[in-house]
Each structure stands twice: as C-alpha cells, then as structure tokens.
Amino acid sequence: MQPNITGVILAGGRSSRMGGNDKGLIPLNGKPLFQYVIDRFKPQVSDLVINANRNQGLYKESGIPVIDDIITGFVGPLAGMHAGLSYASTEWVVFAPCDVPALPSDLVSQLWQGKKQALAAYANDDERAHPTFALMHISLKTQLADYLIRGDRKLMLFLDSINAQRVKFSGKADLFSNLNTPADCDLWEQKRRGQ
C-alpha cells in the first residue's frame, strides 16, 4: 500500500534557455506552465509544495505553499530536492519539474511500486532517464546536503551513488517532454489546439 507522499514541483532554476524568463510562469494557452503540472501532479500526492527561488508571490497565487532552496546559489534541481526533503512531513517525497505539462498520471504509483527496497527511484522511458522525476526517502536529506556542500551538482551521479532504482515507463516518452525554449512552448500549444 502506498503511504502519504509529499509532491514537490521543481521551479527553482534560472531558465537560461527561456531567455531568463521564469519557465514555470510561461503562459500556455493562457495558463502558466506550472499550473499544468499542478493539475496532473496534485491528485497523485497527499501534500504539494513548489520549490521556487524567484517570483514566489506569483507561484503562491496558486494556493500551493512555496519554499526556496536552503543551499543557495541556483545550484540546480538537487538543491530543490534538498529543500523538499527538508520541508516534508511525510517519509517519502516525489519530485517533478515545472516544465513538463503532460507528466504521467501514474507517475507516483509507478515510482512507488518500482522502487522495490531502494530509498530512491527515478523515471526512465524507452529512450532515456528522467532523473528530475524522482521519489526519495527523507533519510537521504543529510547525504544530499553533503553532496551539494562538496560542490557536486550532477543529479544522475547522486542517484547512482545512492543506488536509486530505475523505473521503466514504457511507451510514455511523450509524457516526459519538457518545454525548454519558447519554440517548444509554441509547438506544444499547436499540438494541443490540433487535438
């Protein structure tokens, strides 16, 4: 049986490929990108929080609590994961980036079932790993902080170092498509209008 799990939307990055515009706030069909993630993610978790390091007031308008990085300096998704592990009142925390509007509706249940005895798991489709879609036990918080303090930033290296379980999401590569550029957003909107 799946326990209560806290969900964390990772929106703390610099969005350099979006020209510095806060990626989660980019409008898609009149709705901010992160709101699509909330709509898909919230039904899967018992508690939801957004990790953001700027424009926090705009994220708070969603009614979802907003937390910033404890380890500062825009050090990447691992800093947001550390903040989420520090915030959570549940034993397990699941993460999703703010730029994947079609994330799988079974993300959390699949990660939970696929983790086996591991303290962490991450998504992998037929083509590649998606380490920002990860489930972690809060006991990893100290190990993650130590990793970041040493200056390490690579998410996959951290997941490998803790023996995270890779969980296969076959036939779902399109659900993990992230929108990194304005052109990606335009293409996504065109596809939605064509459906």
Swiss-Prot record:
> Is-annotated flag, keyword Cytoplasm?
yes
Q: What is its main location?
A: cytoplasm
A GO CC term assigned to this protein in UniProt: cytoplasm
Q: Catalyzes what?
A: Mo-molybdopterin + GTP + H(+) = Mo-molybdopterin guanine dinucleotide + diphosphate
As cofactor, the record names: Mg(2+)
Which residues are noted in the entry as GTP-binding?
L10, A11, G12, K23, N51, D69, D99
Top-level taxon of origin: Bacteria
Checking Gene3D superfamilies in the record gives: Spore Coat Polysaccharide Biosynthesis Protein SpsA, Chain A (3.90.550.10)
Sorted alphabetically, the keyword list is: Cytoplasm, GTP-binding, Magnesium, Metal-binding, Molybdenum cofactor biosynthesis, Nucleotide-binding, Transferase
Gene Ontology molecular-function annotations:
GTP binding; metal ion binding; molybdenum cofactor guanylyltransferase activity; nucleotidyltransferase activity
Cellular location(s): Cytoplasm
Q: A GO BP term, please?
A: bis(molybdopterin guanine dinucleotide)molybdenum biosynthetic process
Q: What is known of its domains?
A: The N-terminal domain determines nucleotide recognition and specific binding, while the C-terminal domain determines the specific binding to the target protein.
Any idea what this protein is called? Molybdenum cofactor guanylyltransferase
Species the sequence originates in: Yersinia pestis
